[in-house]
Amino acid sequence: YQFLFDLFLYQFSNLDLVELQRCIGLDDGNLNLLFGCDEMLMAAQSLGIDGAVGSTYNYLSPLYYRMLAAFEKGDLCEAQSLQRQSVDLVGLLNLVSPLSASKSLLKRIGFDFGPVRLPLRSLTPSEQKAFDESIDHLNLFQ
């Protein structure tokens, strides 16, 4: 039955990197562990995660690809700079509703999946305007 255990992927979505290290070490390091906090991907990568699952990868994957490539090349300054951009974006998402803001961003880049489901609500026009201005200021979507 070991082959069944090998098929499982485990998602770790906690900001506690000490606990992440403990999980990485479980089963002699043989777990397939995915990290679920986009704004801390580089830190988790340095600890040895196997991959990542996150919402901002849907619309900001080029940034994360560049960040991981820089990290693998040993260009920590570039990787850190790109990770800070992710941190800034996640911070903006958390100022409003992360899911509503993510839907807004997806629509902005051409993927309109409709409004969020109840009990969530879409951004109000004033929230949308402020959010768009903040996103423009980050200069992530050119």
Listing of model-derived features with the role each one plays in the protein:
Residues L9-L47:
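Ligand/cofactor pocket segment of small-molecule handling proteins
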Residues Y1-Q2, V18, D112:
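Hydrophobic transmembrane signal anchors and adjacent membrane-proximal interface regions, especially
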